[in-house]
Swiss-Prot record:
Chain sites annotated for binding glutathione: S2, H43, T44, I45, E57, S58, R59
Family: Belongs to the GST superfamily. Theta family.
Protein known as: Glutathione S-transferase 1-1
GO biological process, alphabetically ordered: glutathione metabolic process
Gene transcribed to yield this protein: GstD1
EC number from the UniProt entry: 2.5.1.18, 4.5.1.1
Subunit record text: Homodimer.
Entry function: Conjugation of reduced glutathione to a wide number of exogenous and endogenous hydrophobic electrophiles. Has DDT dehydrochlorinase activity.
Length: 200
């Protein structure tokens, strides 16, 4: 149900790759078993193994899947400027948007800590940035769906099930409603979100 796993599932769907998914029980420490550490010493999920080649970090996996299996480069164009904007959005998603989710919600969910209002402000600030990026834009980076949209829709949908009010951000809300319709694998993403919702 995690956002990074769902972004990989949607990207695989977009390029027509059938994933052989293996569920790891993190609470039971399955990601710390020697056989998994051999594949990924950083023991993070998702981890992709493609004919013996192991890769982790969801956004790196997304780019790899598109570069290796995409019929066209539309999800991650070869043009340096287009690609730079996509990369910026991916890093924004990882370092600002999704990070704000983790900083605010994870201590509450996993450590039963009280809500931190300062961390909540960081979420609002991240959404304000995203709202600005999306001004007059149908897509997050350029004029068509890219891996940036897929990563961001995985994150934004996670905020939705956590109860964050996305509708307060008009540009984000408009983009998100469209992304639900045009992102391959959306229904599987939403099913994963609903799994994740049990934590909130």
């Amino acid at each position: 149900g995690s956002s990074p796993c769902r972004s990989v599932i949607m990207t695989a769907k977009a390029v027509g790759v059938e994933l052989n998914k293996k569920l790891l029980n993190l609470q039971a420490g399955e990601h710390l078993k020697p056989e998994f550490l051999k594949i990924n010493p950083q023991h993070t999920i998702p981890t992709l193994v493609d004919n013996g080649f192991a890769l982790w970090e969801s956004r790196a996996i997304q780019v790899y899947l598109v570069e290796k299996y995409g019929k066209t480069d539309s999800l991650y164009p070869k043009c340096p400027k287009k690609r730079a904007v996509i990369n910026q959005r991916l890093y924004f998603d990882m370092g600002t948007l999704y990070q704000s989710f983790a900083n605010y919600y994870y201590p509450q969910v996993f450590a039963k800590a009280p809500a931190d209002p300062e961390a909540f402000k960081k979420i609002e600030s991240a959404f304000e940035f995203l709202n600005t990026f999306l001004e007059g834009q149908e897509y997050a980076a350029g004029d068509s769906l890219t891996v940036a949209d897929i990563a961001l829709v995985a994150s934004v949908s996670t905020f939705e099930v956590a109860g964050f009010e996305i509708s307060k951000y008009a540009n984000v809300n408009k983009w998100y409603e469209n992304a639900k319709k045009v992102t391959p694998g959306w229904s599987e993403n939403w099913a994963g979100c609903l799994e994740f919702k049990k934590f909130f």
